[in-house]
Amino acid sequence: MSSMKTQVLYKSRTGNTEMLAKTIFEAIPGNSKDIALLDGQTNYDMADLYFIGFWTDRGTASVEVLDYLGSLEGKKIALFGTCGMGNSPEYYKKLEDNIKVFIEDDNEYLGAYICQGKMPISVRQKYMGMKNAMIQNFDLAMLHPDKEDLQNARVFVKEVFEKIKREA
């Protein structure tokens, strides 16, 4: 496992996913690792294990992330992402399901970590005419990703490596 090359690739629109990506990168054991912004290129340093990060819009990830996921073959893949809406495990599972279908069957899917992320102030202005629950959700999102979210990301990395270790 120590010789396993790990790559963290992410797409971030507002900085939330970037924050998570850096935390996940730091939590990966060893030195055989790299982190890069996913910007549409496909010639990233080839790795054995990929942590692929995304922001969400309308229940899925950006085209760049989905295209890259579809291009990977014979790799171990873990997903991570942020979304402004709801701190809801059910919604996060739906997001995961919507995105993981782009991963080809010859890859080993290792799970996903998704947490709430802060939204642009323009979203709050749009919410002013909506229900109080949406305003409350925005206000809660301003505190995320928080220390607990980042710690949970570290735990997720540990769980991924434990899954790999059990297979060996």
Residue ranges and their predicted role:
Residues 26-34, 47-52, 56-168:
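FMN-binding flavodoxin-like domain, especially the glycine-rich phosphate-binding loop
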Residues 1-4, 168:
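Basic/polar N-terminal segments that are highly enriched at the extreme N-terminus
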Residues 37:
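A short, aromatic/hydrophobic, helix- or strand-capping loop or linear motif
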Residues 4-5, 47:
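Secondary-structure boundary/capping motif
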